[in-house]
Amino acid sequence: MSKDYRSLANLSPFELKDELIKVASGKANRLMLNAGRGNPNFLATTPRRAFFRLGLFAAAESELSYSYMTVGVGGLAKLDGIEGRFERFIAEHRDQEGVKFLGKSLSYVRDQLGLDPAAFLHEMVDGILGCNYPVPPRMLTVSEQIVRQYIVREMAGGAVPPESVDLFAVEGGTAAMAYIFESLRISGLLKAGDKVAIGMPVFTPYIEIPELAQYDLKEVPIHADPDNGWQYSDAELDKLKDPDVKIFFCVNPSNPPSVKMDQRSLDRVRAIVAEQRPDLLILTDDVYGTFADEFQSLFSVCPRNTLLVYSFSKYFGATGWRLGVIAAHKDNVFDHALSQLPESAKKALDHRYRSLLPDVRSLKFIDRLVADSRVVALNHTAGLSTPQQVQMVLFSLFALMDEADAYKQALKQLIRRREATLYRELGMPPLENPNSVNYYTLIDLQNVTCRLYGEAFSQWAVQQSSTGDMLFRVADETGIVLLPGRGFGSDRPSGRASLANLNEYEYAAIGRALRRLADELYEQYKALGKE
C-alpha cells in the first residue's frame, strides 16, 4: 500500500492511532473496528444510579432553605437532622433503582467503617451540589477515609493499615502523573541528567515525559521478558541497585502485556530496597490491578518508597469522569529526601511555599503536590471537584460492599472470553500465563506466525515488512486498528489490542482477519519454494 509508515515513526502509539483510523475507515460499506484504545465498553451502573438519586435528595435538602423566595433558589445543606431526613427519603423511594444502594452505603459507613453517618451524608450532599470549594483541597475528609479503604483492599490486600495512607484526589491517572513529575522536578528530587528506571513495555507517556526538555532524564529500561511470561528477570531488576537510579516507574499490571508482577519480582524489589536502596523512589500505576487475580502492588511491599497512582477509569468504565488518586504512606522516603536537600535548596522551597504555612519544612510531599498543581498561589482553590469526589466514593462503596466480588468476576469473565474468542479464530489457544490480566493482548507477530506455520516461515514473515507496515496493511485490508507494540517499548514485532472496548463477535472478526493475512503470507512463502 502507499502509506509510508516511516514518516510517522516519531508519533506516539496514540497519535499513530489516528492515522490508522483514517486508513481503516477509508473504504465504504465496511465496519471499522478500533481495538487500539483501552476505553472499556462496560461500566458500573449501580453507583451511577445512586449518584443521580443522591442528587435529587441533595436538591431537596438545599430547598429547605430560602423556600420563601422565588422558585429555584436553595441554600447550603444543614447538618442537623440530616440522617433522619435521609432515612425517610430511603423509605419513601426504596422501590427506585439506586436508592437501596444508598441505604446500604449509609449502613456500611456507620456500622462497618465506624464513621459519623451525619458527617458522611452532609459531605455527600454538599459535595454533589458542588456548592463549596473542596476542603481540604487534597481530598474531602470522609471521602478520603472511605476511598483509602478501597485502595488498600484492592491494591495492597490489606497489608498496609488504611490509617497510614494519605490520598490526593486527582483528575484521573494522567493528571496524577503530570503532577508527580512536576513536583519531583520543582522539589529537586529529580534533576536533569538523573537516571530513571522504567519497566518496559510501558504506557507510552512514561517513555515520553522523561525525555521532555524540562526534565531531560536518562532512561534505564527494565525489560520484561516475553519468553518468561513478561516478568522482569532478577538481572533486570538488579539495575535498581545502581545508586544513580533515582526512581523506578512502572505500570503494574503492565500495559500492553497486561501481566501483573509475580511474587518473585515483588520480593526481589523488596529485597533491593531493604538491603541496597532504602532511598529508591518508586512510582507505580496500578489502574489494571482490579482485573488481576490476587493482585499485590509494589505499594504493599515497599509502602515507604512508593507513590501509588490509581484511576477509576477502567474498572468502573469511567474514563469521562476523570477520577483518580495518588496514595502515599505517611512515613515515606519522599518526605525524607526533602529533609536531606542542601540548605540552599530548602531555602528556595521555603520561599516557594511561604504563603501556605509558617513552617514550610513540615509540608509533606503529597501536600506540595496539591500546591504545585495550582502553582502554589492558587492552593486555596485546589482540589478535585466535589461531585467527582462523591462519585469516587460511591464507586468505592460499591466495590467494598460487593463481598462476593460479583462485579469483578463478571468483568474478568467478559474480557477473558473475548481473548479466547480472538485467539480461537486466529487458530490457536491464548498463551497460558497465571499472571495475565487480559485487559490487553499483545499479539506477537513472530510468535503467532511461528505457532501457525513454523520457525522458518516466522523468520521470513517478520523480514518482509516492519510491524508498522503490517499494522497499516491490517487497517487497510480489514478495517481493524491495532497499536504497535514497539511504541510502548517492546522489542518484539507486535500489535496491541484492547480486550475491553469491542464486543465478542468483533474480536472474532479480528482473529479471522489476522488469520487470513497470515495464510496469505504463507501462500506467498510457499510460492517462493520455501515450504
Curated annotation (Swiss-Prot):
Q: List the disulfide bonds.
A: none
**Enzyme Commission designation:** 2.6.1.1, 4.1.1.12
> What molecular function terms (GO) are annotated for this protein?
aspartate 4-decarboxylase activity; identical protein binding; L-aspartate:2-oxoglutarate aminotransferase activity; pyridoxal phosphate binding
Q: Which residues bind L-aspartate?
A: 114, 255, 496
- Cofactor names: pyridoxal 5'-phosphate
Q: Which PROSITE patterns match?
A: AA_TRANSFER_CLASS_1
- Activity regulation, short description: Inhibited by 10 mM Co(2+), Mn(2+) and Ni(2+), and by 1 mM Cu(2+) and Hg(2+).
Domain of life here? Answer: Bacteria
Q: How does activity depend on pH?
A: Optimum pH is 5.
N6-(pyridoxal phosphate)lysine-modified residues are 314
The record, for InterPro entries, names: Aminotransferase_I/II_large, Aspartate_4-decarboxylase, AspAT/PAT-like, NHTrfase_class1_PyrdxlP-BS, PyrdxlP-dep_Trfase, PyrdxlP-dep_Trfase_major, PyrdxlP-dep_Trfase_small
Q: Give the GO biological process terms.
A: alanine biosynthetic process; aspartate metabolic process
Keyword set for this entry? Amino-acid biosynthesis, Aminotransferase, Decarboxylase, Lyase, Pyridoxal phosphate, Transferase
Q: What is the catalytic activity of this protein?
A: L-aspartate + H(+) = L-alanine + CO2; L-aspartate + 2-oxoglutarate = oxaloacetate + L-glutamate
UniProt temperature dependence? Optimum temperature is 45 degrees Celsius.
In the record, the note on similarity to other proteins reads: Belongs to the class-I pyridoxal-phosphate-dependent aminotransferase family.
Subunit field text: Homododecamer.
State its role: Bifunctional enzyme that has both L-aspartate decarboxylase and transaminase activity. Has high activity with L-aspartate, and much lower activity with D-aspartate, L-lysine and L-glutamine.
Q: What is this protein called?
A: Bifunctional aspartate aminotransferase and L-aspartate beta-decarboxylase
- Organism the protein comes from: Pseudomonas sp
Species lineage, top-down? Bacteria, Pseudomonadati, Pseudomonadota, Gammaproteobacteria, Pseudomonadales
